[in-house]
């Protein structure tokens, strides 16, 4: 028993358990606790417990008294069950003792706490029933934890087949990421909170009537509507006559009555900033600020707040969730299941003709039971004709249902034509289902999920046609038939399947969202059900609607404000935190999960990505081969090539028909040959450039001499061509690498990643080179054969991949060549080809002049002639901007901008046709555009030329804008009636800003990114329209005519709705004043009207679709919900909630997901595998990485060194960061001159400023002024500190409002330095900054589009009368106000109400037949198209592009320790080592220092010279080869390390992979050559050493004998002659040595290893001999013998040594050495040219 228990514990250890429901004991007495049915019963009881607590509210018991006893009974039963379970588990596990005791298990503790809460709830209910405790008392809050028992119901699904440590790491890492982004959000909330406090302060000044007295402020004292004002006369809004501007707080109103939103102090300010960042109600705050303070301050604050907080910072949450989900997806692939396995392996597949006539592979079950129908019926049932007939009938049914409309109150509703049509269609589809069941058999029919759905519709619609059920919830079944139409389009069907996947992910997420809503609703219900005057949480349905409203963000501020006012001032902060946390989780994390799931479903599999990469490359090659259709038209005409014509020729001679292009080749031949020679012979070109006036004969003679001298062999020429091709590839690769790079990481491993990748490459190349000669030997074992076979397979796969890549490259080159050949053939055979307007000649001087003017552009970039890299100049960014477009385009951009500025001054009251000053810009624009278009047409042609003006949509738009401007300028209509052609022309004229899209290349790229994903966006639109059509048809059938009601709430029947009544006026939404006894709200008398709601109705499908489209944008759905519940019934509220949930959670997130996927596809990252995407992120990180701007520590241990240690200590840095935060807290209240609190706060700020001066002084002393100035962060600190010192001086000198404002600005600037001191904040701020930089052109595109709509809005709605939302602040009277309104609409703030205000028609307005500026009516069709198109383009597409950019950039900084290629720690280590080598902090080091840098690296970048000596040589030689022995930068070395640290086969794309492999192969060959040379040199040195040693032994013996003899013989005459000859020889040897050494230095390897350097050092000082010195003398023997005899007789040290060596025969080693030397000499003469050229050229 014990062994079995241990084994079960061990097996369960690596798997994450799902709680204490597992069987942990085999005790027979408590065996029931381990039964599966007990587990299921307890899970059901958990759901029952949640239902019970949802019913347990005072209001519910008041409406349904028996529920009090029902809940008491249920809770009692649940209490007994869970208590018994708890006792049994305590008995099994033990309470405290043991490893698995009850207290030590977290799930058991949770279950025990739930049992305790159940007991508390039960005891409390007993007291409530006995009337001991009041039901409305706060004691009911003890039930708040009870809904958490819902976790027990779903705990079983938390069981993962993964190691617990891995799941813990994933959750920990995800939590860290979410926590980091939350800190980032808090930083911006605090920043804008401080800014709000100092810029605005309180909004307590209102316009009140003149006789208002303190303590007597009522609703009738305020202006209607309530208006804020400014006490200063120069700024803000001034009250009208009869009113005065007063502070309501001074008049006696409390904080609760004034409302909680504002910028009074830092807490309220952060609360208000968060409300505004949710884009709900922010615009009304801005209007209040505009009325109370200077206008520019409000616009700056709120627009930047929306841009940074709402659009950038909050979208980082989406990026975090997407990245985290992508990582979890890889780990949980087993749990979700694979998306590709749609059919089981047991089923077979066959081709089937689909409805569109195409073929599809469909699964066919061989064993499917067939029905009893005849074969002809079965064949008919499977035919495409039958399929299309049924779908066409579904289409007709949908059209008929959509045609239904409200026909009036007196019309008979039961048996109209729509009902009869529905009966007919129901019978038809019933017959279809019966036929399929007859043909397939019931089992075969029901096995298909599609047939199950059809059967459900058949049953539901059959019940629906029953008269009593016709207008009921069964209508859903009828309208759901439209879903069957998805089968018509295979693309739509595939898209739907791709998005929703197997349904498990999205379904589980929907269940999770619903469960979260239920739990949070139950918690809020028990928290607020006892609060008086709050009806939002009295019952569970109301609580659910309120929490769902917060989830959708529509009106969530109203829910929170009502709750805050009801709970009182004391509990308001806690309640606000509760709602904000729930809103934060629901809107950011939960919605981001939906986006992540949809993006995951749109993701392709890894193998499909590589296949699609190849297919896409092939498709690109095919498309490049074809000419555009406008040029292929010339192929339809007969060929008429131009022939040679000679102007002066006698008539006796006839010119043969020779093509002019053929003769031109010979005419230009001499010039081409000369250019070719100049390319080959650099000396020739230089000499000719030096003497340009040299005669032609001398030139030819000089060239001829050069040609004769330089004789090129065939091999050298081929070698040159090969090197040139390789050089081009390497230059391209170098250029690409110099512009890219970056790094992130993994934990340190035992083995360096450089070493691992090097061994992978070596193994791969050994396979590639050795597999051709692989033969199976007889003695090999089976394992060896298997290994060899796998190696062969791997080699073949690699070889096949290589061949595919090369084939695609060749295909691309051939396509480009083919296209050029086609163009040349057309140019030669058709005289009118490439002739602008068929008039201007191809090479005409005027056309060449136009080309020069059109294509002239600024170009200040300098290119390195060796590497081809672009050298960065000092102002290269400015130069790049100037060279972005041509000079002509710059002129037109300037003219267009000036014209748009002029258009901004137009209004309905200052029109261009009546204002001569506005006409100047109009004339200038048309004149300049005429000149531009004429130049471009004469240079490039209009349409039928290769580079025509009209070759894409941009050219068409240019011509269209020009024609519209020209027609308007010529016409200039004086009277423009509304909805006329002249007004349409004025609207089209507003498209002028779109010209900038065409003129700027990056703007054209934005447009391509928008329209390239049009197909997917179109499919999403179809899905959403289908959803809207389903619900619109349902709404028409259920709510048509039912939403109309009398505007007097006291009248119920239509007959009584007549006469007049008094209606109250809404004065203010912010103030919470209570009516005093006898007081009435302001109002007036109006007639009673029986009418639909103003903004929506369901009387026909068109109006219903419009209402649902507004609801789909999550605007106005709360009003639709309230009207439906109030006028039709509470049960029908489910309708709008289901639609909003589907539209919000799935519909809108679909747009986000599709736009992000399309953006990735356009960027080229959609088809990248995981490794390739990480490699791209790595290169992008490398761009951002910079050397550390930190000077080295002073050498000695003096005062500066101690200062350096102090300033670099972490404790010092944290202290400074805390001081910065402490100084920022001083801005918690507004610094006002009149406030006595300001003086001590400013004094404390002065103290902080002196502390920061001390900090800067210490750093300057420690680092020296030059070292301090290296860091940008130090420069910023110095700037802020200097400003602080200036402020201190001004503060004590002046002490006025301006000095206080300056002091607050200095503190805010100091607050920004927090980001640099915190790693996570710095990383996330970098994400936002880079996103802003990359999205600059998208933002400019949004603004240009906004400008076009603003100009059109001024023309269409400039004089519309004020309504509910068109008012003093929001209107289209000028372009500036129109831009403000449109920016408000971008955020979705009541855009539908503004649209309805602009739709106002007579009799509610005054029309005018002659001029549009004299009427105050709107334009119904214009408003519909205007607002809907603007909202879809901007809010659904353009804003989601911002999200896509943020997601892309966040992935650069998203660090996971396991999966990244290089971590931040590795990069930090490299920066520190670089600073050690780059001691001068220049950012570059000489090439020879690279080897020292590489030897100093440790960790994952370490190169072990004992194991990876060859890798070390390759890396050093790569640096020397790419940079020609010059200086290398920080990014050069980091880029080389990045290439060496990845598996290039997996990470690099096709072109880059080829270039990189070619470079590495070349480096290997060169290093191999150098290694051979080094080895031969060492061998020769060793041979020399042996020969010298043998000669020295004999010489020493001879010398000793000669010394003894020399004592007796001293012939002076002979001694003086012989050594002189020898000395000459020695002197010759020495004179030859420098040449030899220089030659060896030239040919020595460019990198030397340690062994070679030691050998050279050991040989230093030894005699060096020439190569020919070891050859035997050729003189006759007698002479040598005579000489030797003389020498022996007379002696001499040098001579004796030479003679001995010559007389002894050479040993075998010496003869071998001479042969090696001869071979070595030949190799040097041949290979020195090749290798030397390689090194120098590249």
Swiss-Prot record:
Residues 1-36, 91-106, 159-173, 323-382, 440-447, 493-502, 600-886, 940-947, 1004-1015, 1160-1210, 1261-1271, 1319-1331, 1448-1738 are cytoplasmic. GO terms for cellular component: monoatomic ion channel complex; plasma membrane. SUPFAM superfamilies: Voltage-gated potassium channels (SSF81324). The chain crosses the membrane at residues 37-57, 66-90, 107-129, 138-158, 174-199, 295-322, 383-403, 417-439, 448-468, 473-492, 503-530, 579-599, 887-906, 916-939, 948-972, 981-1003, 1016-1039, 1130-1159, 1211-1227, 1237-1260, 1272-1293, 1297-1318, 1332-1357, 1421-1447. It comes from the Eukaryota. Voltage-gated ion channel responsible for the resting Na(+) permeability that controls neuronal excitability. NALCN channel functions as a multi-protein complex, which consists at least of NALCN, NALF1, UNC79 and UNC80. NALCN is the voltage-sensing, pore-forming subunit of the NALCN channel complex. NALCN channel complex is constitutively active and conducts monovalent cations but is blocked by physiological concentrations of extracellular divalent cations. GO terms for biological process: calcium ion transmembrane transport; potassium ion transmembrane transport; regulation of resting membrane potential; sodium ion transmembrane transport. Contains 24 transmembrane helices (TM) that form four homologous functional repeats connected by intracellular linkers. Each of the four internal repeats contains five hydrophobic transmembrane segments (S1, S2, S3, S5, S6) and one positively charged transmembrane segment (S4). S4 segments represent the voltage-sensor. S4 transmembrane segments lack some of the charged residues (K and R) found at every third position in the S4s of the NaV, CaV, and KV channels. It is found in: Cell membrane. Glycans are attached at residues 210, 216, 1064. It catalyses: Na(+)(in) = Na(+)(out). Disulfide bonds join 207-239, 229-245, 1046-1057, 1405-1417. Its main location: membrane. Residues 795-830 form a coiled coil. Residues 270-289, 544-563, 1105-1124, 1379-1398 dip into the membrane without crossing it. The lineage of its organism: Eukaryota, Metazoa, Chordata, Craniata, Vertebrata. This is Sodium leak channel NALCN. The keyword Transmembrane helix applies. Residues 762-785, 1602-1679 are annotated as: Disordered. Belongs to the NALCN family. GO terms for molecular function: leak channel activity; monoatomic cation channel activity; sodium channel activity. Found in a complex with NALCN, UNC79, UNC80 and NACL1; these auxiliary subunits are indispensable for the function of the NALCN channel. Interacts with UNC80; required for the NALCN activation/inhibition by GPCRs in neurons. Found in a complex with NALCN, UNC79 and UNC80; UNC80 bridges NALCN to UNC79. Interacts with CHRM3. It holds the Pfam family Ion_trans. PANTHER family: SODIUM LEAK CHANNEL NALCN, SODIUM LEAK CHANNEL NON-SELECTIVE PROTEIN. Residues 58-65, 130-137, 200-269, 290-294, 404-416, 469-472, 531-543, 564-578, 907-915, 973-980, 1040-1104, 1125-1129, 1228-1236, 1294-1296, 1358-1378, 1399-1420 are extracellular.
